[in-house]
């Protein structure tokens, strides 16, 4: 039986990170095109798209998502709050332990075939996986001494990493086991942004 992916796309129209000096997006950046890319690359045979829309900054009826199905409306106003609500939504769905939950923010491009690549990763001895190899691991001096183990699957190679930008996947059974950790590092955030790095360091301590 092939694993099923439940994608939880968290969609909003304001991010405090976007105002940081190193986060300026190019003029051609467009969340509508990002969404179209996701819809065109998702494989409906193995993946189901769920949208979590934060109406704090405006009603969904004013957006390109107004006619989409499988939408959960929340009202949080910050990333950590929306992540906590998404965790609660997932907890209430009754997914099987083998269901792959993919937390996705609204500004990631995907390549063709990403669903099968993501499922490939769960043949490795890992609990969580991200499709995003963040640039900070290569340019941030804080990672100068980072050592990563390399894993190989049929399609690509992977590395272990201490952070994911809160866009990552895991089996539902693993999320149930670690739910208190996932919740804590959002609930305890001092600035409304989940403490992703600290979370994955803590998860690493638990194996």
Segments (PLM) and residue ranges:
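Conserved catalytic core of nucleotide-sugar-dependent glycosyltransferases
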Residues: 109-183
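A short acidic (Asp/Glu
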Residues: 18-20, 60-65, 85-86, 112-116, ...
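A short, conserved alpha-helix in the catalytic core of glycosyltransferases
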Residues: 174-177, 186-207
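Short beta-strand-to-loop acidic/aromatic patch adjacent to the donor-nucleotide binding site
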Residues: 97-109
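Short acidic, S/G/P-rich loop/turn micro-motifs used as interaction or catalytic elements
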Residues: 13-17, 56-59, 107-111, 135-136, ...
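Conserved donor sugar-nucleotide recognition element shared by glycan-biosynthetic enzymes
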Residues: 79-83
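N-terminal anchoring/stem segment of glycosyltransferases
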Residues: 2-78, 89-95
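Well-ordered, non-membrane alpha-helical segments in soluble/globular domains
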Residues: 24-38, 114-117, 191-202
